[in-house]
Amino acid sequence: MLIHDAIIGNLYPYDVDDNLILKACIDHDVAPEDEYSYEAKSVVARVSIEILVNLISLSSESDSGYSLSYNVDKLKERICFIAKSNGFADVADEYDIKPKVYIMD
């Protein structure tokens, strides 16, 4: 399995353009054609999260007679899941849609 394939797996069920995956890989200094390994898990997660965050700002798109829309809460849930699975607590907290209770002093 290639890193590109692992990223696509993380993004499922969201379909994104290969150029977006390539750009995110370049930004994170990883080659999409390299073999995926346990050592690459963290960077693949970061690349996947970056792409999903881009989809949040997009929320919907249309092209040549078809349109797509994205459920922002579901995107945030996916980001949170990937972040928690890879130990990125700060990212998980930022995108966690569950209500939070704060104790005021």
Which residues does each predicted region cover?
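Conserved short "hinge" loops at termini or chain/domain junctions
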Residues: 1-43, 90-105
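Residues that form generic nucleotide/phosphate-binding pockets
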Residues: 10, 24, 50, 78, ...
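Short loop/turn elements at secondary-structure junctions
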Residues: 16, 53-105
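Short, hydrophobic/amphipathic alpha-helical patches that form generic packing surfaces
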Residues: 42-57
